[in-house]
């Protein structure tokens, strides 16, 4: 599996804002949106393009556009904070949804929503989730995508734990992962350390 860790001072500054416990909900959402744009730019750096004929106010010329815009799949609820910015950068992308809660006793994923095309053959898929902790939610999501025929899967997250990276690689060895940081590991409650807390709660408030 390809693993790309974004090394850029602007990304690091926004990650610092996300980590800081003093950052409020609105500022957290803003920093997450800005980091999402960085992740999308990096993830599409080598995306296939096609030529398109256009006219400027002065002359005819040729430009580029993505040859095959992806399906964006935010993992709810934390991934909701990434989808608008990703869709703004990729306006022709389609959007699907996977909703997964976490059982706080077992730390296992509890799926509650799925809205995806039946056939994903030939369609690039970009999964959006700020956190890759145990990998339970992400492996459930990629297993679902693979079962629908997806072969081109890119995962965007802000912070990952080594355990989650390993779980994703086992589930989808041909996937690509783009993240801003790979942290030390997980605590006893299976939260990433140092991490940034519960990304859903920090965006939208406690459940």
UniProtKB/Swiss-Prot annotation:
GO MF annotation terms: GTP binding; magnesium ion binding; uracil phosphoribosyltransferase activity
Cofactor dependence: Mg(2+)
Annotated S-S bridges: none
Binding site for uracil: 192, 197-199
Function summary: Catalyzes the conversion of uracil and 5-phospho-alpha-D-ribose 1-diphosphate (PRPP) to UMP and diphosphate.
HAMAP family found in the cross-reference section: Upp_B
Name by which UniProt lists this protein: Uracil phosphoribosyltransferase
Protein's organism: Mycobacterium marinum (strain ATCC BAA-535 / M)
Lineage: Bacteria, Bacillati, Actinomycetota, Actinomycetes, Mycobacteriales
Gene (UniProt): upp
């Amino acid at each position: 599996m390809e693993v790309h860790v974004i090394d850029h001072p602007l990304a690091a500054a926004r990650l610092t804002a996300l980590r800081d416990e003093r950052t409020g909900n609105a500022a957290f959402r803003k920093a997450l949106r800005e980091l999402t744009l960085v992740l999308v730019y990096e993830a599409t750096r080598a995306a296939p393009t096609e030529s398109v004929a256009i006219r400027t106010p002065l002359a005819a010329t040729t430009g580029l556009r993505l040859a095959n815009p992806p399906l964006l799949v935010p993992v709810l609820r934390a991934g909701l904070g990434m989808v608008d910015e990703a869709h703004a950068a990729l306006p022709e992308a389609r959007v699907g949804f996977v909703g997964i809660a976490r059982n706080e006793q077992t730390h296992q994923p509890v799926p509650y929503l799925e809205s995806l095309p039946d056939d994903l053959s030939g369609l690039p898929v970009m999964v959006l989730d700020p956190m890759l902790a145990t990998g339970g939610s992400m492996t459930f999501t990629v297993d679902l995508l693979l079962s629908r025929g997806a072969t081109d899967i890119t995962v965007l997250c802000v912070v990952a734990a080594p355990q989650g990276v390993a779980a994703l690689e086992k589930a989808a060895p041909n996937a690509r992962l783009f993240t801003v940081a790979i942290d030390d590991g997980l605590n006893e409650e299976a939260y990433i350390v140092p991490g940034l807390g519960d990304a859903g709660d920090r965006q939208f408030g406690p459940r």
